Structure formats: structure tokens, C-alpha cells
Amino acid sequence: MRGLLYLALAIVSEVFGSTMLKLSEGFTQAWPIAGVIVGFLSAFTFLSFSLKTIDLSSAYATWSGVGTALTAIVGFLLFGETISLKGVFGLTLVIAGVVVLNQSKAHAEDKKQTACE
């Protein structure tokens, strides 16, 4: 359970860092630059903590997939960026891929545990 908390914090930190990257205007604004550094440093720190209990493939796929989707939503909501129907479809596929990967890992773990009993 702690691994999932760290993974969620890694995702939020990465989205924060990406948002600050946009606000830094090409690394010309001091406070957003500090936000980029804090955001990405926190993201990788929390991701590394999550890897103590979550498989690398699941953690990284979830981090990158959910982070990508949330960053697109932040871009839409905060910066007025557009998301085309194809873009929505692509983000849906990314999220579906993360879900399928995590379900297959859970299924494999269940089989492994049943075999040991």
C-alpha cells in the first residue's frame, strides 16, 4: 500500500514539474525553474521509493501513462491547450494499456501465490 502512495506522489510531482516547465517560459522565470527542480527531483525520489514494493514495469508504465494523461488535462484546463478527438483516443489507449499491464501483473501474482499453496 505504501508503494502505491509513493507512486501517486511521484505522478503528482511529475505533473507539477511539467506544469512549472511550461510556466518557466524557456527557463527564463526563476520561481517556475525552482518548481521544475523540486517537482522532478521529488518525482524521481518518490518513484524510487515506490519501486521497493512495485515491479519496475508496472510502476514506470503507470507513472508515465497517468502522468501523460494528467499533464494533457492540466494543459487543457490551465493553458487553454486543445485536445483533439484523436488525442483523447490516444490518451484513452495509454490509460487502457496501463490498466491491462497492471491487471496482467496482478493475475500472474495470484497464479504464483496459488501455486505455492
Curated annotation (Swiss-Prot):
Please name every pair of cysteines joined by a disulfide bond in this record: none
Subcellular location per the Swiss-Prot or TrEMBL entry: Cell membrane
Gene Ontology molecular function, alphabetical: transmembrane transporter activity
- Which sequence ranges are marked TM in the entry? 3-23, 31-51, 59-79, 81-101
Which Pfam family would be a valid example here? Multi_Drug_Res
Q: Kindly state a single biological-process term from the GO annotations of this entry.
A: transmembrane transport
Q: What keywords were assigned to this record?
A: Cell membrane, Membrane, Transmembrane, Transmembrane helix, Transport
**What is the recorded membrane topology of this protein?**
Multi-pass membrane protein
Gene Ontology annotations for the cellular component aspect, listed alphabetically: plasma membrane
The main location class comes to membrane
For this protein, the record's InterPro entries field holds: Small_drug/metabolite_transptr, Small_multidrug_res
SUPFAM superfamilies, per database record: Multidrug resistance efflux transporter EmrE
Recorded family membership: Belongs to the drug/metabolite transporter (DMT) superfamily. Small multidrug resistance (SMR) (TC 2.A.7.1) family. EbrA/EbrB subfamily.
Q: What does this protein do?
A: Part of a multidrug efflux pump. Confers resistance to cationic lipophilic dyes such as ethidium bromide, acriflavine, pyronine Y and safranin O. The efflux is probably coupled to an influx of protons.
Subunit structure, as described in the record: The efflux pump is composed of EbrA and EbrB.
- Specify the protein name: Multidrug resistance protein EbrB
Q: What species does this protein belong to?
A: Bacillus subtilis (strain 168)
- What gene makes this protein? ebrB
